[in-house]
């Protein structure tokens, strides 16, 4: 049964695309055709995206104070808006769903201007700039960590959680395995879809400072940027520590599930995925985010005992080595953290968001949806 087209708008980074991918799976399973509109930067993350068609429209970030660059950005957004209008007029989607970031601005502005039911999904605990710009225009605001009943858009906010991909739900079925005694200890290090240069320096330096007995137990999976990869590999090879180092892992959910401990950033998708899978984590929020959204995301998980949060400026190699040594020597404490993480997970977020999309596409309201949701 073909229920019509739902157009998803997501781009910029994998953090915006992954929840859109999860929603796409859910919508297609219930009979919708799903199209994705994105930007050129995000195309490398769309290989497994279950869209019937993928469309690329121009977009740009408005942040520069340079008048020439600002003019170029505005022109690119205007070009994207015109392209999005043509696309929507041709597809005639039943609804348009945006997942944040400036690549969603042209499609959502076009959709709301053309009277198409529209929704934005905010993954973080703090609403991003693009979503703030769009929130007053759309019918509903779905929140990964946003609470219901507070804020300027309380009446239209639904706390759906962040949808996670089928691979994450599958990985959630793998129970946590504490590494007691001399058992191998798998450390997984990643920094979001673009890697984290800080970890490429800090983690190998910390491993250098571990006792030989601990290093002999250690196996590392680490995401590193292409320019950092060879240097990271060289350190682990010198130490005799088995390590897989790559800019991007296609099977990240499975690697998270196999970990005894994670060291990672705290983007919304990352926090949502590790909580659904249920693994202990050292979270190091990205320190340069304008809205400090990663710190807020991390705090939500730490409040349930599912993670330890450390500011990057406070995480020296010596301190990280001590944290690793303590973690490797206390498997019961890590098991408790894993349980705390799992308690915060929302594995049904994709289903709930799909129900909201269907309700708004059918002409219902957020108030009616809240009365009937299950």
Swiss-Prot record:
GO BP terms in the entry: carbohydrate metabolic process; cell division; cell wall organization; lipid glycosylation; peptidoglycan biosynthetic process; regulation of cell shape
Species: Rhizobium meliloti (strain 1021)
Family from the record: Belongs to the glycosyltransferase 28 family. MurG subfamily.
Entry keyword annotation includes Cell wall biogenesis/degradation: yes
Record: residues binding UDP-N-acetyl-alpha-D-glucosamine: 13-15, 124, 165, 193, 294
Record keywords, A-Z: Cell cycle, Cell division, Cell inner membrane, Cell membrane, Cell shape, Cell wall biogenesis/degradation, Glycosyltransferase, Membrane, Peptidoglycan synthesis, Transferase
GO cellular component terms listed in the entry, alphabetical order: plasma membrane
Chemical reaction(s) catalysed: di-trans,octa-cis-undecaprenyl diphospho-N-acetyl-alpha-D-muramoyl-L-alanyl-D-glutamyl-meso-2,6-diaminopimeloyl-D-alanyl-D-alanine + UDP-N-acetyl-alpha-D-glucosamine = di-trans,octa-cis-undecaprenyl diphospho-[N-acetyl-alpha-D-glucosaminyl-(1->4)]-N-acetyl-alpha-D-muramoyl-L-alanyl-D-glutamyl-meso-2,6-diaminopimeloyl-D-alanyl-D-alanine + UDP + H(+)
Membrane topology summary: Peripheral membrane protein
Domain of life: Bacteria
GO molecular function: UDP-N-acetyl-D-glucosamine:N-acetylmuramoyl-L-alanyl-D-glutamyl-meso-2,6-diaminopimelyl-D-alanyl-D-alanine-diphosphoundecaprenol 4-beta-N-acetylglucosaminlytransferase activity; undecaprenyldiphospho-muramoylpentapeptide beta-N-acetylglucosaminyltransferase activity
A Pfam entry, by short name: Glyco_transf_28
Principal location listed in the UniProt entry: membrane
Protein's pathway: Cell wall biogenesis; peptidoglycan biosynthesis
The protein's name in its UniProt record: UDP-N-acetylglucosamine--N-acetylmuramyl-(pentapeptide) pyrophosphoryl-undecaprenol N-acetylglucosamine transferase
PANTHER family: GLYCOSYLTRANSFERASE, UDP-N-ACETYLGLUCOSAMINE--N-ACETYLMURAMYL-(PENTAPEPTIDE) PYROPHOSPHORYL-UNDECAPRENOL N-ACETYLGLUCOSAMINE TRANSFERASE 1
UniProt-annotated location(s): Cell inner membrane
Gene3D superfamilies reported in the protein's UniProt record: Glycogen Phosphorylase B
Function: Cell wall formation. Catalyzes the transfer of a GlcNAc subunit on undecaprenyl-pyrophosphoryl-MurNAc-pentapeptide (lipid intermediate I) to form undecaprenyl-pyrophosphoryl-MurNAc-(pentapeptide)GlcNAc (lipid intermediate II).
EC number: 2.4.1.227
